Structure formats: structure tokens, C-alpha cells
Amino acid sequence: MTTQDIPSGTTVMYIPAEVCLSSSAVSQELNANSPTGGVAAAVDKLNKIGGQNSVADFYLFLKLLAEYEAEENSAYFGWLDGMPRLFYNAASMTDFCYECLPPLVFSLSRLEKVKFDNFKQVLSKVDIISDYTKNNDEVLKWAFNAVYTRAYADKDGQGSDVTITPLGDMFNHGTFPQVEVYFDEG
């Protein structure tokens, strides 16, 4: 942590592009590792139940679950181990919590909860995640919340491709950004 301002444009951290988790690259990897086509079947079902705007996030959700299962063998283990485990957003709320929300916040929270429920519903088709993990609600909430709070849309902001930048996701969680993020398209 610094106690003095640094000049604009100063590099604070460099994260190689190949370490970043982009939904387009992750989708290719997961589909290639899916022996019975379960990942593609889950995405197809997600599209059919109205989750077509969530497909990119779903791929990152699956990637985090796969890396979670790899434990210490995951190249992302240190980063995953340093992530928060407790979240206070819609996927983690109880029904009573929803009743206490003002109408607009309630409707926005329900959208997030429906997205999580859709992910859980189609997860049964995925063949690269163990049944133990598929039935572990706490792990599923953790992976969903990690994606939901850390993924950002492509430069056009259309969300067709979303990315999580390991370690780089630790910046800009306050009201005012601490750093300006720059991509060199490595």
C-alpha cells in the first residue's frame, strides 16, 4: 500500500493475457474436456430456459468449479484460496431477506437469484464437475458470487465475452476506483 499518489499511467501490476479467464477461451477449454458433451448440453438448456444473456458467466462459473475441484493442482489455487467466502448479495439471501427489501432492490435481487437458480438447474447436465460439488450449495454460491462480483464485460460492454483477471480483480471495489485498468490484448 502506498501513502503517496503515483503518476497517472504508472504500471501497478501486470497480468499476462493467458492467465486471464475469458469466457470465450474458457468455453473452448471446457467443451474440449467434456467427454459426453455435457457442457454444451447445459448451455443449450440454459438458452432454452431464458438464460441466453448468462452463458458467458456460466462458462466462468463452471471454470471456477473445475479449478476448485483441482484443489492444490490448480494453477489458480493461491488466487482462489484468497477470495472471499462470504457474500451478502442475492444468491446468498434467505426468503426472509427478500421480504425486507424495497421493491426496486427486491426485483433486481430476484433477477440475480433466478440467474443462480438457472445455473444450478442446468448443472446436472455438466459432465466435468463431480456430483459432490454439484450438490454443495455453499460452493455453488461461492463460485456464482465470485463470477458475479469479479467478471467484467468486453471492451464494448455488450457482455458477449466476460473476463476475470486473477489478482487484478482485487482493485476498484470501493466507490471511487483506485486504479485505471488497461488492456494490451497480449
Residue ranges and their predicted role:
Residues 1-19, 24-28, 66-186:
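Long, positively charged leader/targeting segments at protein N-termini
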